[in-house]
């Protein structure tokens, strides 16, 4: 299992924080997420994902149509996505 740190920008931080889409998408895979926001009131947010089977599975998952729909609903700007793997 892997732990990932992911950063990206969103259109509306409050909408992103309130959305159930993360749990709906990642929960069935056994992946949990802790959310973070930039205290400088920017649109940058971050997550720590635990229980990720492996990076390849995670990357394939977030490139799926279902993930694209969830990201769109959450206002995620996919072009800003940065993923770090625990060393």
Language model regions located:
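Short S/T/G/P-rich N-terminal loop/turn motif that feeds into the first structured element of a domain
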Residues: 1-87
